[in-house]
Amino acid sequence: MAEKIRPELLSFLQPNAAPLRILVVESLSYLHDLREMFPQAELYAVTADMDAMEMDVPAGVHWQILDYLSVPLPYTHGYFDYIISDLTLEKADNPQDIAAGFSMFLKETGAFLTSFRNIRHWSVLKNLMEGHYYNIVSRLYTRAEFENLLYASFYKSIRVQQQKREAPTSLIERLVTAGFENELDDLETEFYFVRADRSMPELALLKSMYTTAEREQMVRLIHRIEYDVETLAAELCEKIWAEFQ
């Protein structure tokens, strides 16, 4: 039988005192740890559970009671530093719409932290060998498929971590003999944790230091230097002036 996921998405983050904005979608168990890791952050939470606000959660959380799979999130584009949600796309009718939609609410330096159940895990394959499939209402993914989905949803950098559950003796050997590749213990990885960034790491620092308008001005100045615009303009003016003399 499938096991429940152990919440480990926060391993992608380092505690700090920055005034971040962090949105948690359904995975409310992260809220207490987030408050400890980021004491100055504004925490937001989205859930379809009407009783969620009565749960043991940190004070000051900004709530939205809605089903994110069917109702658009009511936030400003480019608002959040992080969006955190386990198994976000497992029940989505159109997962790319959800993933791309979430990316719009992230700052250019922001990241989407999520996870997915690996369809190549030995437990899924073993059930299929026995004539069963228990994920009729869920979407399971391979690592490559999930990464491609995120790249197609406007994320520029993908990092993953594994949550493993070992196979019974000799099962992996049987699967490999049958033709299943097992690169990086994929067949024993039940869940993948994913950090999807809106920007490449080498650009994220630059974007955090300068506004969009400032970066556009820098690009124009660099282009003028690169193509020696001032010199070319001066030579053109001299040529035009010479023709009229």
Task: State each model region's role.
Residues 84:
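A conserved beta-strand element that flanks and buttresses the S-adenosyl-L-methionine
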